[in-house]
Amino acid sequence: MMTFYRTTRLMLSSAAVLSFASSAFALDGNDLLKKINDIYGQQGATIAAQGVDIDGSTVTLKGASFKAAGMDDSIPLGDITLDGVEEKDGGYTIEEIDFADVDFNKDGAAVSATDLKLNGVEIPADATKGDLGSLLYYKSAHAGAVSVTKDDVEVFSIEGADATMNKRDDKSGLDFDAKINGIKADLSKVDDAKAKEAIEALKLQQIDGTVAMKGSWEIGPGTIDISEYSFDFKDIGKLNLAFSISGYTPAFAKSMQEALKTVRSNPNQQEAQQSAGLAMLGLLQQLTFNSAKIRFDDASITGRALDFAGKQQGVSGKQLADTLKAMTPIMMAQLNVPELQNAVSTAVNAYLDNPKSLTVTAAPGKPVPVPMIIGAAMGAPQSIPQVIGLKVSSND
């Protein structure tokens, strides 16, 4: 009997210890939600949940909703499931976040989205430190099909989208890329007569293309280098934007967020906007311009645009192109930069004769402080091409 008693007491004691240990190491769902909102709160946004359920390492935000700054109503998100949640150094790591499918109606349009998820998510313990570890990070993001329907007709859709981020091993920065595939828009149902005429003349009733981005962020000097930000649409063309600036450090981003937060909290919006403008001018002192490039590769839209614009003026597309070629050097002469005038005239002439590509490049010999560019634009606009090393070329 004594043996049974001792055994029972040992079992109960062990159960109590295990129960205490379990509660001590259980995830705190409310703390997790708070830390998520610490991040979004910097942009004036919040994520709310009607309840937080925990099952092992899985946290479910029940009846979640999102509200951004300036929004009157929240966007319902449904249940958000966070799998593989672990507390780490006061913050959290999450293997995968799955969002409920989106399906709602707004202003007569039905919007749906499926297969929304994030992988390899890191929630910082302190979002105010101003370093790489204080940022919301995810290794990959994915969205499945997205559709917008109006009057039972699909007017816009996306086949899918993917994005990745990669922290450098030396913690010096991030590399990232994103792509939206199968973007389709139906413009054939546009009601406005003039817009409909232009859409039909340009053959833009059905738009089909992709959007892609690739770049990096070096934390120390705050260098953001976007090597690709492209819009590539069938039978239209591909527009690619690339640029590089320095000075956009986490501290700069934090200062900008605080300035915007001050604007949002000030009931006198006119006064707030003026204060924000002054604050932004001060922040711009920290930025430098490294380079930029805009390139358009034509896929037949230029010819249709010339024909349509020429028709509006009672001339052919060829005649309009000849007029533009004649006007270009006259317009460029106002800048009083002969070298640029000749380069632009040559590029425009070649492009209008045989539309293939048009490229505008800004590559100064050394990085230029952004305030210097603003000052030149205000005081001596004609000096801008020399300040930023502006060049124009075509069909190269």
Each language-model region and where it sits:
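Gram-negative bacterial Sec-dependent N-terminal signal peptides
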Residues: 1-26
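Glycine-rich, small/hydroxylated-residue low-complexity segments
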Residues: 20, 27-396
